[in-house]
Amino acid sequence: MGGVGGCVNLRLKPNQHRHNYQKRTMTLQRILLLILTVFTLGAYAQKQPVDFVNPFIGTSNFGTTNPGPIAVRGMVSVSPFNVAGPKNLPLEKDSRWLSTPYVQENTFLTGFSHVNLSGVGCPELGVILAMPTAGDLEVDYLKYGTSYSDEVSKVGYYSNTLDDYNIKVEATATTRVGVSKYFFPKGDANILINLGLGLTNEQGASIRVVSPTEVEGVRSVGSFCYYKPEEAYPVYFVARFSRPADEFGVWKKPTTHKGAEAEWMGYNGKTRVMPGYAMEVVGDSIGSYMRYNFKEPTVVEMKVGISYVSIENARENLEKETSTRSFDQILEESKKNWNQYLSKIEVEGGAKEDKIKFYSALYHTLIHPSTLNDYNGDYPKMKTRETLRTQDTRYTVFSLWDTYRNLHQLMSLVYPRQQSNMVKSMLQIYDESGWLPKWELNATETTTMVGDPAGIVIADTYLKGIRDFDVEKAYAAMVKSADQIQDNPLRPGLMDYLEKGYLTTKTTNSGSVSTTQEYNISDYAIAQLARAL
C-alpha cells in the first residue's frame, strides 16, 4: 500500500476452498473499507487554495493591506486597529501619511474597525471601532489600548490575545456584517464602541444605546486624500451582543472652552461618562459601553451590521446575513465561498512559497471593487445620496487609475459576471452623476489621480466578449469625456490637449506628460470600441 492518498494495489488469491468463502468476503470488505478511508484521508490532506493565502502579505512596508476577515468583495472587514497612539511611532496615523488601519510592525492596539480600505494610498474609513477590555471602565484609547500576542490570520478569520486583559478575540465576516467573539476572563468586563477614533480625517457621529443588547449609530467619513470635504457622507451601523449588559452608557468629550464660560463648566474639556443614558448622543469624540460582571470565564459574541443608506438597513443586513447562523457556520461559509473563487485558477508546479504568493495576490484582487448595496438592493445615489435600488451588485471603490491596466482584464477572464456588474455599476454612476467614474468611493467621486480610465476598462471588457450592458450608452459617456471642454472633471486641460495634442506644465500641475499619456490611452480605447460597434 502506498502513502496516504496514494495508489493502492491489491492482489487477491483465487477461491480454492468453498468453506473459506465467508471469511474471504469479510476480509475483502475490510480491505475495501480501508481503501475508501485512505483515499478520503488523502482528499482531506490535499491543500485547498484558501490554505495558501497569507493575509499578512502587504501589511508591512506601506503595502496598506490589513489581515482582518472579509467576504469576497465585502462591504465589511474586521481589522485590528493598531495605528493610533505614540507607542506606535513612527508608523502612527496622526504623525505621518498613513493609509491603513494596521501595520504589522506596530504593537499597540486600540480596537477593531469594521469599515476599511485595502491597498489604497490615502487615509480614509477605518471607523466603527469596537474594543473589549477587562476591569474598571476606561474610555480613553491611549489608556485602554494594549499590546497583543498569538496573532492568527487566515481567509475569513482573525484572532489575537489582548495582553493587558487576557482576552482572546476571534473575528469573521459576511458581506455586510462583522462578527466577533470575545473570550472574557472572570470578573468585570467592558465592550467599547468608539466613534471618535478612526483613520478618516472627517469627524462627527451619533450613537444610541437601544437596549442592553443593541447599539446603533452613524459615523461621518470622507475627504479622501484631503479632497472635497463638502462630500463627507455617513456610515450607519447596528451592533448586537449575545449577552445583555449588566450596565450600559455613553461617553462624550465636549469642546474645551475658555474664559468665564469655562469657569462655570465643571466638565470643561473633560470626557463625561453617562451611565444608563439611552438617548442619542451627537459629537466628535463619543462612544458607548456595555459592562458586565462575569462569575466565570464567558464568551460574548458581537455582530456589527453596516449600511451606507440607513440604520434600518444596517439592522436588516445584520438580521438577514447572520441571525440564524453561528460564528463557526459563518466562518465555514466564508472559507467555502473564498475557495470557490480562488479555485477558478489552478496552479501546478513551483514551490509552496510560490503558491502562497500567487493565491495571496489573487485573494487581494477579490477585495476591491467591493459591495455598496444593502441586502435588499438599496444603495446611495451619487451626489444626492437619495436611496436607489439595484437588482445586481452595485460595486464601489473604483480606483481606476490603479486597476485599468491589469486587474479588470483578469476579472474579465476569470470572473466575467463580476466584471459585467462592475461595468453596469460604472454606467449607473454615469446615469446618476453625468460622468463615468474616475476614483469613485462609496457613491462619491474623489477625482484622485489623473487620466480618464473608466472608458479603457469598458472598451476592454466589451472587446473580450462581455457585452450584456448598454454599450451605446457606454460609448456616449466615453465620447462626452473626450469632447466636452468646459466643466469636465475627468479631463482637465482638454482644450490644450485637443489643440496641441499634448498638455503643458502651464495647463496642469498634475504631471503634464503622464496625463497626456493617459488621455492618449483613453482615446485609443474609444477608437477601438468605435471600430467594433
Where are the model-predicted features located?
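Bacterial N-terminal signal peptides that target proteins for export
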Residues: 21-32
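Accessory carbohydrate-recognition regions in carbohydrate-active enzymes
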Residues: 46-456, 462-517, 521-533
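Hydrophobic h-region of N-terminal signal peptides that target proteins for export
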Residues: 36-44
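Glycine-biased, low-complexity coil/linker segments
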Residues: 1-3, 31, 35
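Ala/Thr-enriched low-complexity intrinsically disordered regions
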Residues: 14, 25-27, 37
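Short hydrophobic targeting helices and cationic amphipathic motifs
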Residues: 10, 16-22
